[in-house]
Amino acid sequence: MTELTGVSIVTYQHIKVPSQGEKITVNKAVLEVPDRPIIPFIEGDGIGIDIAPVMKNVVDAAVEKSYAGKRKIEWMEIYAGEKATKVYGKDNWLPDETLEAIKEYQVAIKGPLTTPVGGGIRSLNVALRQQLDLYVCLRPVRYFTGVPSPVKTPEKVNMVIFRENSEDIYAGIEWPAGSPEAVKLINFLQNEMGVKKIRFPETAGIGIKPVSKEGTSRLVRRAIQYAIDNDRDSVTLVHKGNIMKFTEGAFKDWGYEVAVKEFGAKPLDGGPWHVFENPKTGQKITIKDVIADAFLQQILLRPAEYSVIATLNLNGDYISDALAAEVGGIGIAPGANLSDTVGLFEATHGTAPKYAGQDKVNPGSLILSAEMMLRYLGWKEAADLVVQGIEGAIESKTVTYDFARLMTGAKEVSTSQFGKAIIKHIL
């Protein structure tokens, strides 16, 4: 261990700890943020090299403007993906000290990561979520005036998705067709469990979908608490319980149980919907549920009826990206992955390697994820300025190519120029 401003820090092999700054800590489930927090960041693969510097510039400008030098983020680079293999060795896509640094410093932000080709880690993003138990994927979706949209009233979309991150078929428990494991499991299901419904057992890949009461409860608890803290009027449990009764159906039932037992929700008109009074504002919060396929229709037809969404992993993936398309695409869709102690904020899009190093793509997703991070730290003033800056740049039609090609009279600018336009509207 070494000492830094009175705070013990793990000694790292390749990570350079800033000479100034302090750790964020958690005390009795409350985040304690110093005025000069050290924030680890993963640049990301592909276009990460373009968007990460812009994100940091925008955040630094917003923090400086808000607090006049009294607060400042000390950025600390950590490694994952292709860059990690160059620093740590060709097969080390997710170094142990990267995970340790995120745990040590509590809050981090990352660009997009390449999924390694071949065996081993199937997805670096999934590996990070599982190894850090980041059980909430938080995806707020809102519309910025002037952003091109394929729907008539995108301004009606204002939802926050709580996607369960640790279970469901994303747990990665599956085996390919014909493998010894698949054959063994199928034989067990047929011979020991009496399963007759596998149509082509000889050529079937097989997977397992775990959904637990504990996993469901902690997600729904966070979603309901978010609705309370942010004065939202409803929490919707989205599921396919009509088909998968003991996994998705159980998710719905356990979700209602949390609302009743922990928040005092009462049946609304005899149920199944429930309602309770927000203890902070006195407003009513409705707990409801919708079948996933019907919900995907409703977000197009009646989006204003939905506010906070709690759902399982696969449904959450579909829903998050479908909603993002309504308000301008994943180029400006932010996201975070949360445990009870760690917050990892991220760009929600891919690495787009063909654009890497061209200073061309929209950095909005990562910048808005940083805005979420600032709000998570309690730095509301800086977060509001980031939103102000993005709104100003878009309203002035100074945008990257993905928006410019769809906007009349727009001025197409580079990634870095878009960052400067945002900062102009911050300052």
UniProtKB/Swiss-Prot annotation:
Binding site for NADP(+): T114, H349, G350, T351, A352, P353, K354, Y355, N362, Y401, R405
Gene3D superfamilies, alphabetized: Isopropylmalate Dehydrogenase
Catalysed reactions listed for this entry: D-threo-isocitrate + NADP(+) = 2-oxoglutarate + CO2 + NADPH
Biological-process GO terms, alphabetical: glyoxylate cycle; tricarboxylic acid cycle
pH dependence, entry free text: Optimum pH is 6.5-7.7.
Cofactor: Mg(2+); Mn(2+)
Enzyme Commission number(s) of this protein: 1.1.1.42
Effect of A52T: In strain: GQ212, KoQ229, MAN, ME, Priscilla, SQ217
Iron recorded as keyword: no
Effect after changing V183M: In strain: Priscilla
Outcome reported for the amino acid change (mutating G419A): In strain: GQ212, KoQ229, SQ217
Transmembrane segments: none
Swiss-Prot/TrEMBL site (Critical for catalysis) positions: Y170, K240
Keywords annotated in UniProt: Glyoxylate bypass, Magnesium, Manganese, Metal-binding, NADP, Oxidoreductase, Tricarboxylic acid cycle
Substitution effect: V87A: In strain: SQ217
Annotated consequence of substituting V63A: In strain: ME
Pfam families cross-referenced by the UniProt entry: Iso_dh
Subunit structure: Homodimer.
Family statement drawn from the similarity comment of this UniProt entry: Belongs to the isocitrate and isopropylmalate dehydrogenases family.
Function: Catalyzes the oxidative decarboxylation of isocitrate to 2-oxoglutarate and carbon dioxide with the concomitant reduction of NADP(+).
PANTHER family: ISOCITRATE DEHYDROGENASE [NADP]
Protein name: Isocitrate dehydrogenase [NADP]
Organism annotation: Coxiella burnetii (strain RSA 493 / Nine Mile phase I)
Lineage of origin: Bacteria, Pseudomonadati, Pseudomonadota, Gammaproteobacteria, Legionellales
